[in-house]
Amino acid sequence: MQRSLAVAAATLLAATTASAGTAKGTLVHKGKTVTLAHAYLVVGPDAIDPAKKIRRLILTADDLSAKLAACKVMSCTDGEVMEGLVVEIDGGPRLNYWMVLDDQKIQHSDTEEPSSLVATTDDAKKLAGMLTIDDTGSGGPTVAVEFDAPLVQELTAAR
């Protein structure tokens, strides 16, 4: 009986843990190229204005499904990214982004025109499309990535 309950619990956990979506593209920064392979959409409160809900697109080289599923607060979701790009959608008139490389030792953040993200799907459960950034003029990255990001986490606390 206990074994049956354990198997049922494991099956339920696997079914409720959202998996990564796909990303196909690159992030290039000062000669280093990262192949982006995984895409996630996270929804939760803004750190500055917790009454405001934002969407966060996370694009990474590594699969962070389990780590993101374990997050209980919004600030955890970007802290898990060691190599990739985090883009805040709905945070203001521009897209806010944060790039990290080499286990977060290299970082760059800036904003982009909303037109740099061309969505083919944009609903409560998924964001898909193309993101193109060329921020080399301010020391930032060049990003060209097609993505299909399912909603993997909807959080209620910013921190």
Q: Language-model features: where?
A:
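Surface-exposed helix/loop patches within compact recognition domains
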Residues: 47-122
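N-terminal targeting signals for Sec/Tat export/insertion, comprising classic cleavable signal peptides
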Residues: 30-53
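Short, hydrophobic/aromatic-rich segments at coil-to-beta transitions
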Residues: 21-22, 52-56, 124-130
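Bacterial N-terminal signal peptides that target proteins for export
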Residues: 1-8
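Edge beta-strand at a domain terminus
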Residues: 21-22, 27-30, 130-159
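Amphipathic hydrophobic-ligand
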Residues: 32-36, 109-113, 141-146
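Extended, loop-rich substrate-binding clefts of extracytoplasmic carbohydrate-active enzymes
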Residues: 111-136, 140-142
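Hydrophobic h-region of N-terminal signal peptides that target proteins for export
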Residues: 10-19
